[in-house]
């Protein structure tokens, strides 16, 4: 029997049944358990229906693909012979067998309910066996599966499971059934006997087979090198798969010997292959899953291409721009003969993109030389090495490798040497997305990310998932495995706690509603704000779950290959994998719980408004076709549509995965169709729709609803779950004279969705409502006679809802995407600045003069002065260019000073493995914020520090081709090169253009407002249009934030750009922007701040 975890979920109001969810850790299927079935109506109909609703929503979900398992269906009307401890004919009586406790006694009966715990049942059973209940700790209740045998034969137990003290035996009995041919009974056993049995049954195989699997997995990951030509004659050559370069090769035995001798040295024949045969070393690839690191060229001819059903190249590359046959590499023997005369010739195929040393080769064959760089398509870059030609790489090859562009680690922009020519467009890379932090600020960072986005705002709703995935990526690549493991568990726990708090608050609000609940006391508008938070974290949890599921094994494999741990290496990575599985299980639980809660409350809304559709007043049929353009929807139908429309809008606004959104709406359709059909079949003639005129009206109402569903793109699920109700209403809308002439067989063909029992029930109630005598033609025929009188088949069950399956594709969080949403990137910049603030608080005495305090946020650069062109201003308007480069005179005078460190001190950067780090020059202009930005301005200082270096130039206009800009559209995140040489240091405006830093700040209005005085730049010596900060009130929100300083320019207010906006209009936007406001601010240099401080004298 699989282990189980029982979680009580719904903190519902007192008159709504609390549902529970059973999460199966290893069950292959997903099922929905229930303890209630629908019965004829009672006086308290609302309470009964709520119980049905709650139990319908008790279900499980798995990120694996699962189908509904018929073995978990509820028991039938008769007693189940496989259950020896319970009988349906005697509910509430549990037989506890105690052969091993009291000799000569077969069993004792105790009373139990579904909520009875195993510990309490042990106490009751001991009392029935005349034993002391105080000794309950010496006994355990066991779930025993075995064969009862025929009469006279003894019970033969095959396996048993000990119940935990707080487990619910009857609930487990309902959900887990023994397989066919076996029976189950509950036994009372002594704990000492159970422990003795457990000590004898020692598992000696699991650890061995798992160790064997790990060894085989490591060998498969490292691959088996191809043999030399001598060895290849006796065995076919094999590809080197996922090896490492020749400088870090470790001995690896062949596959058959790996299981027995994993630590033996590699045979000389295999090592000789890589050190003597030419090979291609992968420098840049496309797919981590499919690319090899080394391709050994040991054959006479190699084909390079993309593997297809009709093409199977010897070197398979997976990039989309690789042709099925891209090029061939063949061995060419020169006329001189001998080994020295053997060369490899690259022969490109027509139409294939092939470059050697960054030069297109066209159709001409090329003789490969040791150290050549091969570019295949846009993604693959390989280094050709031929140990037979030369051992060290030639100087020209090293120069080409050194010419690869460096990138700023903060913004991903390409850096180039000062005065060097512009790089070709093909080499310019997009900015990388990184979020670097230290382990000591991990908790603070997670808390800030969790509270960063308001679900009701305009920000990208998947920003938390995106930022948390960046945290996971950084931790996996730079921290120890233990830190990575703890981070996964922290993230899953914080998400789970957040969802639980939001649902708890919603339940407390719902508990205050007075019964009976009506539409007036339970409006959808009041429910939407609370559902926003639940759906918000459900959407982010789905993205996080998929990311961890896909990336965590790759990260663990990378750690295993790179980290050198002795002794407990296997246990360390085993713990990491276990933590990854626990995090995925927790996130899966969040998705399930959030799904259940949302459907629960939405179904309550529908339960209130759906019955009115069956009792709707007359309506104007001639306006039926124009209901979209005016208030033609009747009030009863408008309420139902408003619930579905609000749900659809919420799912789209919160960027829920489309497959999960469709499943949630399918649930609501299923519930609505089942509820209305059961009411028609249950209430019968008491409903006005059984009279023909009202039946026509109700049928028309349903058609209007289906029309709305089709217009919203939900036609298929709506028609599926309303099919039986539609057949029922069409029958009631059929004229009486026409209906009387139909025979039973004709009715079965005309209304095929109804089973015989439901059709017979409808016809019987139709006769009562119409006061007409029995109609002989409506009597069930011989084939349908027995089924027509089965009363249990009349009402539809809530136990067969549409399945819930997590999606496997279509996710939006992709850290390797070419570009990212502007809103997400703005928040990434804010989080980086937030981390800067934390570093400043951690070392307030060090100041900017100690670069070691900000270690890890610099880009490591080789010897030489570099200047970067990047750090763009991420524009909120995706239709506009994010960054363009302009000549110096066209740039607004904005800038900021750089923090200068003491001479001779240079920061070093170490990685997670403690590798060596040398003294390196750093591009200090890549800092997101000067560590000490002054709040006020003191012009009496002796001198103003001049900025140096360059990390980006931003133009705030939206033209695609500004003066001096590059022709054509500029993609967001691309690094742009100057069309003109940089201005000389003596230029009056160069100091204001060398630095442009843009950040986001959120301020909450205080008693005295925001506390900053603004001025139009045209009325200052600056003479530039724009809104600038002239004064900061001490103690105000603006001053307390710590990032704003005099002279800073306000670019946006709550997402609205101030470009071209008048001063009065900009001030009005700030004055009426609400209590919490968000500003996009550009830092200014000291020269600009001095000019902003003074106003022009009146002319």
Swiss-Prot record:
Keywords: Cell adhesion, Developmental protein, Phosphoprotein. It holds the Pfam family PDZ. Residues 302-377 form the FHA domain. The keyword Nucleotide-binding does not apply. Transmembrane segments: none annotated. Residues 1000-1085 form the PDZ domain. Residues 221-265, 868-941 are annotated as: Disordered. The keyword Phosphoprotein applies. Residues 525-792 form the Dilute domain. One of its GO terms (cellular component) is protein-containing complex. Residues 226-237, 916-927 have a biased composition (Polar residues). One of its GO terms (biological process) is substrate adhesion-dependent cell spreading. InterPro entries: CBD_Rasip1/Radil, Dilute_dom, FHA_dom, PDZ, PDZ_sf, RA_dom, SMAD_FHA_dom_sf, Ubiquitin-like_domsf. The modification Phosphoserine is found at residues 235, 245, 248, 250, 422, 432, 915. Residues 90-193 form the Ras-associating domain. SUPFAM superfamilies: PDZ domain-like, SMAD/FHA domain, Ubiquitin-like. Interacts with RAP1A; in a GTP-dependent manner. Does not interact with members of the Ras family. Interacts (via PDZ domain) with KIF14; is recruited to the microtubule network restricting its interaction with activated RAP1A. Downstream effector of Rap required for cell adhesion and migration of neural crest precursors during development. Belongs to the RADIL family. This is Ras-associating and dilute domain-containing protein. It comes from Mus musculus (Mouse).
């Amino acid at each position: 029997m699989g282990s189980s975890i029982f979680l009580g979920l719904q903190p519902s109001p007192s008159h709504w049944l609390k549902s529970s969810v059973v999460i199966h850790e290893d069950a292959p299927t997903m099922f929905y358990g229930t303890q209630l079935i629908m019965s004829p109506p009672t006086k308290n109909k609302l309470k009964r229906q709520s119980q049905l609703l709650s139990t319908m929503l008790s279900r499980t979900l798995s990120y694996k693909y699962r189908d509904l398992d018929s073995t978990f269906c509820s028991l039938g009307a008769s007693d189940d012979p496989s259950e020896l401890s319970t009988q349906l004919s005697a509910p509430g009586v549990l037989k506890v067998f105690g052969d091993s406790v009291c000799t000569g006694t077969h069993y004792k009966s105790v009373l139990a309910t579904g909520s009875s715990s195993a510990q309490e049942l042990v106490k009751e059973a001991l009392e029935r066996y005349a034993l002391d209940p105080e000794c309950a700790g010496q006994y355990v209740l066991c779930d025993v599966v075995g064969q009862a045998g025929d009469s006279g034969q003894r019970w033969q137990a095959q396996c048993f499971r000990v119940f935990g003290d707080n487990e619910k035996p009857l609930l487990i009995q309902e959900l887990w059934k023994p397989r066919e041919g076996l029976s189950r009974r509950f036994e009372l056993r002594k704990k000492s006997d159970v422990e003795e049995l457990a000590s004898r049954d020692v598992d000696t195989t699991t650890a061995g087979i798992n160790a064997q699997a790990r060894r085989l997995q490591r060998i498969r990951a490292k691959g088996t090198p191809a043999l030399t030509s001598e060895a290849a004659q006796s065995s076919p050559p094999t590809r080197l798969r996922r090896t490492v370069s020749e400088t870090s090769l470790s001995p690896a035995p062949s596959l058959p010997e790996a299981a027995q001798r994993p630590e033996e040295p590699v045979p000389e024949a295999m090592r000789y292959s890589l050190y003597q045969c030419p090979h291609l070393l992968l420098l840049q690839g496309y797919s981590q899953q499919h690319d090899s690191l080394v391709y050994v060229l040991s054959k006479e001819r190699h084909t390079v291409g993309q593997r297809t059903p009709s093409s199977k190249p010897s070197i398979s590359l997976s990039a989309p721009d690789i042709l099925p046959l891209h090029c061939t590499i063949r061995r060419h023997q020169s006329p001189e003969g001998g080994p020295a005369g053997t060369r490899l010739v690259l022969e490109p195929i027509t139409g294939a993109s092939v470059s050697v040393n960054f030069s297109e080769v066209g159709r001409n064959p090329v003789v490969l030389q040791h150290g050549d760089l091969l570019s295949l398509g846009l993604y693959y870059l390989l280094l050709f090495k031929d140990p037979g030609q030369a051992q060290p790489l030639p100087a020209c090859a090293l120069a080409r490798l050194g010419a690869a562009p460096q990138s700023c680690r903060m913004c991903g922009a390409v850096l180039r040497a000062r005065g060097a020519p512009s790089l070709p467009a093909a080499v310019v890379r997009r900015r990388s997305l990184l979020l670097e932090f230290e382990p000591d600020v991990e908790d603070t960072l997670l808390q800030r990310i969790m509270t960063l986005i308001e679900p009701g705002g305009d920000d990208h709703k998947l920003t938390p998932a995106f930022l948390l995935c960046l945290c996971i990526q950084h931790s996996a690549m730079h921290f120890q495995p233990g830190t990575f493991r703890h981070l996964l568990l922290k993230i899953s726990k914080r998400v789970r706690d957040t969802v639980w708090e939001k649902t708890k608050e919603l339940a407390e609000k719902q508990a205050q509603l007075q019964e009976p609940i009506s539409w007036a006391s339970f409006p959808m508008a009041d429910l939407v704000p609370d559902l926003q938070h639940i759906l918000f974290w459900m959407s982010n949890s789905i993205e996080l779950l998929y990311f961890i599921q896909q990336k965590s094994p790759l990260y663990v494999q990378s750690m295993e290959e790179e980290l050198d741990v002795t002794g407990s290496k296997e246990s360390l990575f085993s713990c990491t994998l276990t933590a990854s599985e626990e995090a995925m299980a927790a996130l899966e639980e969040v998705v399930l719980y959030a799904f259940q809660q949302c459907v629960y409350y939405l179904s309550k809304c529908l339960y209130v408004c759906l019955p009115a559709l069956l009792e709707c007043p007359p309506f104007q049929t001639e306006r039926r076709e124009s209901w979209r353009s005016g208030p033609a929807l009747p009030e009863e139908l408008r309420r139902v549509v408003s619930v579905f429309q609000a749900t659809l809008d919420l799912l789209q606004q919160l960027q829920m995965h489309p497959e999960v959104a469709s499943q949630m709406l399918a649930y609501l359709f299923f519930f609505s169709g089942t509820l209305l059909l059961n009411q028609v079949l249950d209430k019968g003639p008491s409903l006005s729709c059984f009279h023909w005129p009202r039946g026509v009206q109700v049928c028309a109402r349903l058609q209007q609803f289906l029309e709305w569903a089709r217009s919203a793109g939900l036609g298929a699920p709506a028609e599926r779950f309303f099919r039986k109700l539609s057949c029922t209403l069409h029958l009631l809308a059929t004229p009486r004279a026409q209906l009387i002439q139909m025979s039973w067989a004709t009715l079965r063909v005309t209304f095929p969705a109804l089973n015989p029992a439901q059709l017979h029930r409808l016809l019987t109630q139709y006769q009562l409502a119409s006061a007409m005598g029995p109609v002989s033609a409506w009597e069930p025929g011989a084939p349908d006679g027995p089924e027509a009188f089965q009363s249990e088949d009349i009402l539809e069950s809530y136990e067969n809802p549409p399945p819930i399956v997590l999606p496997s594709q279509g996710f939006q969080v992709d850290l390797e995407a070419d570009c990212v949403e502007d809103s997400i990137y703005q928040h990434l910049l804010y989080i980086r600045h937030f981390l800067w603030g934390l570093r400043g608080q951690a070392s307030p005495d060090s100041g900017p003069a100690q670069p070691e305090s900000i270690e890890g946020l610099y880009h490591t650069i080789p010897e030489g002065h570099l200047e970067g062109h990047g750090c763009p201003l991420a524009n909120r308007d995706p239709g506009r260019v994010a960054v363009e480069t302009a000549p110096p005179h066209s740039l607004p005078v904005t800038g900021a000073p750089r923090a200068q460190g003491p001479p001779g001190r240079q920061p070093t950067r170490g990685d997670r493995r403690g590798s060596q780090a040398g003294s390196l020059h750093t591009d200090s202009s890549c800092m997101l914020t000067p560590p000490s930005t002054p709040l006020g301005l003191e012009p009496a200082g002796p001198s103003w520090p001049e900025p140096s270096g360059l990390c980006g130039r931003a133009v705030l206009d939206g033209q695609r081709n500004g003066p001096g800009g590059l022709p054509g559209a500029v993609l967001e995140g691309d690094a742009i090169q100057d069309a003109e040489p940089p201005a000389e240091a003596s230029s009056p405006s160069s100091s204001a253009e060398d630095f442009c830093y843009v950040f986001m700040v959120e301020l909450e209005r205080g008693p005295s407002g925001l506390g900053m005085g603004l001025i139009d730049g045209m009325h200052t010596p600056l003479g530039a249009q724009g809104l600038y900060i002239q004064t900061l009130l001490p103690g105000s929100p603006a001053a307390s934030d710590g990032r704003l300083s005099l002279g800073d320019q306000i670019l946006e207010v709550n997402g609205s750009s101030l470009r071209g906006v008048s001063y009065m209009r900009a001030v009005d936007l700030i004055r009426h922007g609400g209590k919490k406001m968000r500003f996009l601010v550009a830092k200014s240099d000291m020269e600009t701040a001095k000019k902003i401080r003074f106003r022009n004298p009146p002319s």
